[in-house]
């Protein structure tokens, strides 16, 4: 018989740097998960992706065991890295804070493809372009 799911927790953590301090500790602690075990397993799996922010979905079962799925970095994080900026525009569509090329958009779309709700690379690129536009990043050819 399959284990019963008690909770599903979604967090965004820096790769290889999960610690029992907030936000990880309180989020997992209230569901009775062994926080240190999660931190060790997460850090071991993400050690090669240092410097990235990774969304993780943790499924906690009634017997306090857990599994987790690591997703691809957020599109906004990848766009900021590609454009070489710290943060998006405070006034998107009015203030342009950076530029990315179609080639960079294509690379980001390929990276994000498993997590995007898109059937083709073109559709994925449109999603990423929309994110760029809403962050005040201009897409140039």
UniProtKB/Swiss-Prot annotation:
One of its GO terms (biological process) is translation. One or more lysine residues are methylated. One of its GO terms (cellular component) is cytosolic large ribosomal subunit. Pfam families: Ribosomal_L11 (PF00298), Ribosomal_L11_N (PF03946). Keywords: Methylation, Ribonucleoprotein, Ribosomal protein, RNA-binding, rRNA-binding. CDD domains: Ribosomal_L11. The keyword rRNA-binding applies. Gene3D superfamilies: Ribosomal protein L11, C-terminal domain, Ribosomal protein L11/L12, N-terminal domain. GO terms for molecular function: large ribosomal subunit rRNA binding; structural constituent of ribosome. InterPro entries: Ribosomal_uL11 (IPR000911), Ribosomal_uL11_bac-typ (IPR006519), Ribosomal_uL11_C (IPR020783), Ribosomal_uL11_C_sf (IPR036769), Ribosomal_uL11_CS (IPR020785), Ribosomal_uL11_N (IPR020784), Ribosomal_uL11_N_sf (IPR036796). It comes from the Bacteria. The keyword RNA-binding applies. Part of the ribosomal stalk of the 50S ribosomal subunit. Interacts with L10 and the large rRNA to form the base of the stalk. L10 forms an elongated spine to which 3 L12 dimers bind in a sequential fashion forming a heptameric L10(L12)2(L12)2(L12)2 complex. Belongs to the universal ribosomal protein uL11 family. Forms part of the ribosomal stalk which helps the ribosome interact with GTP-bound translation factors. This is Large ribosomal subunit protein uL11.
């Amino acid at each position: 018989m399959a284990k019963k799911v008690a909770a599903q927790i979604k967090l965004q953590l820096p790769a290889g740097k999960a610690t029992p301090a907030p936000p990880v500790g309180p989020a997992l602690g209230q569901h009775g998960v062994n926080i240190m075990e999660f931190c060790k397993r997460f850090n071991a799996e993400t050690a090669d992706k240092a410097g990235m922010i990774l969304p993780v979905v943790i499924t906690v079962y009634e017997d306090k065991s857990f599994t987790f799925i690591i997703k691809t970095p957020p599109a906004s994080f990848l766009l900021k890295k590609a454009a070489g900026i710290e943060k998006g525009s405070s006034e998107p569509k009015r203030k342009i804070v950076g530029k990315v090329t179609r080639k960079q958009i294509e690379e980001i779309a390929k990276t994000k493809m498993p997590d995007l709700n898109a059937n083709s690379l073109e559709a994925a690129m449109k999603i990423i372009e929309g994110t760029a536009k809403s962050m005040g990043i201009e897409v140039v050819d």
